[in-house]
Amino acid sequence: MGRTLYDKIWDEHVVHTEEDGTSILYIDRHLVHEVTSPQAFEGLREAGRKVWRISSIVATADHNTPTTGWELGYDGITDLVSKEQITTLDANIKEFGAAAFFPFLSKRQGIVHVIGPESGATLPGMTVVCGDSHTSTHGAFGALAHGIGTSEVEHVMATQTLLAKKAKNLLIKVEGTLPKGCTAKDIVLAIIGKIGTAGGTGYTIEFAGSAIRALSMEGRMTVCNMAIEGGARAGLVAVDQKTIDYVKGRLLAPTGVEWDQAVQYWATLHSDADAKFDAVVELDASQILPQVTWGTSPEMVLSIEDRVPDPDKEKDANKRGAIERALTYMGLQPGKALNDLYVDKVFIGSCTNSRIEDMREAAAIVKKLGQKVAKNVKLAMVVPGSGLVKEQAEREGLDKIFVAAGFEWREPGCSMCLAMNADRLEPGERCASTSNRNFEGRQGAGGRTHLVSPAMAAAAAVHGHFVDVRKFV
């Protein structure tokens, strides 16, 4: 019987399997950042251990890094805990080593799930882990990638392996052509709206279909990034020529004979025609409209043409209660049109949407509208995902488009995605955000987050409220 892409990568990396199904899985690439690594390095130090395979480690600082004040160097990190975590990472990498380290203030520094692919650290067929739940991003390359906890970070450092049980296979097929103005972000929000945040629990998702194949690698990364919001630890896309073209020539990519051998192997990284999936979900891309989350979970999402739901129309008591709680927190009334929702702040960035295509997408809308950020918007910020993305955007003049319209053009980092740094919402503020989570307090205590695409966020910044971006493309 044929195997799925997930089956193939899993089988290639299993070292041993116990009778209860627990397997020892070999890990090829370990991405490290400043938040979940200090305890792991300290554990190694206390046990007198070294990192088992230094060449597997690629590290950067991202969660705590400020997006302003870089001219002050480390003195620009005003929060003492943030500063300690960043300097501790510097010291730990100096002591234990890494294949590549992109520290704070360096040219290649950025969000770990942006710098991994752009440096060639993420390759097809790899097992990739990181102490961060959005490690699923790297599945866009036909890699088995997922987040791990801090104790597991230490375990991988010490043994280059991980204890895991194999998940079931879920195929999500998106066929057809997206309407103009709709993007990868709209696809994945629509998927989560359909399957819910628990729909992928216990599964590894393979995203497939003509709409997925039509996406660029950056679009595929956006989709895989939010596999975790759909309940799955990992999401994958089969390798094709786009994958190979993206990887070729990257800093850590193989070269010469090794490249030729790798490409030959990568060509096998797709599900066999007779592979069996445990579950299949299908979506029609032509029916996907620009998406906006209205509540406090990514599954609370509707199209821009819809209205805030009425809990009284929900028969299920648990769901009705969840809607009522979300409406209270979000300060919304049932029946309000989503395109009438005014915003206080706009955030374009995060590991979901901070790559060069996202910057171009947002800048194109701003340029097309030819207007300034609306007066009711207190702050509209654009945060590139890495130093290289920032550099490329500036070469293309995208920063000038944003700044001329009243946006703030920031330094790279996780920024307002999670309010672990200086960028955050104040209580009651409403934000159009290109990030991946809209939980209560995610962007700041009492902050209200609406997840959208970069184009939708840019249009909201200029109009002061959500609008249907299809009007402008």
Swiss-Prot record:
It holds the Pfam family Aconitase. Belongs to the aconitase/IPM isomerase family. LeuC type 1 subfamily. The lineage of its organism: Bacteria, Pseudomonadati, Pseudomonadota, Betaproteobacteria, Burkholderiales. Keywords: 4Fe-4S, Amino-acid biosynthesis, Branched-chain amino acid biosynthesis, Iron, Iron-sulfur, Leucine biosynthesis, Lyase, Metal-binding. NCBIfam families: leuC (TIGR00170), PRK05478.1 (NF004016), PRK12466.1 (NF009116). This is 3-isopropylmalate dehydratase large subunit. Its EC number is 4.2.1.33. Catalyzes the isomerization between 2-isopropylmalate and 3-isopropylmalate, via the formation of 2-isopropylmaleate. It catalyses: (2R,3S)-3-isopropylmalate = (2S)-2-isopropylmalate. Heterodimer of LeuC and LeuD. CDD domains: IPMI. Its cofactor is [4Fe-4S] cluster. It comes from Polaromonas sp. (strain JS666 / ATCC BAA-500). Pathway: Amino-acid biosynthesis; L-leucine biosynthesis; L-leucine from 3-methyl-2-oxobutanoate: step 2/4. [4Fe-4S] cluster binds at residues 351, 414, 417. Binds 1 [4Fe-4S] cluster per subunit. One of its GO terms (biological process) is L-leucine biosynthetic process. PANTHER family: 3-ISOPROPYLMALATE DEHYDRATASE, HOMOACONITASE, MITOCHONDRIAL-RELATED. InterPro entries: 3-IsopropMal_deHydase_lsu, Acnase/IPM_dHydase_lsu_aba_1/3, Acoase/IPM_deHydtase_lsu_aba, Aconitase_4Fe-4S_BS, Aconitase_4Fe-4S_dom, IPM_dehydratase_rel_enz, IPMI_cat. GO terms for molecular function: 3-isopropylmalate dehydratase activity; 4 iron, 4 sulfur cluster binding; metal ion binding.
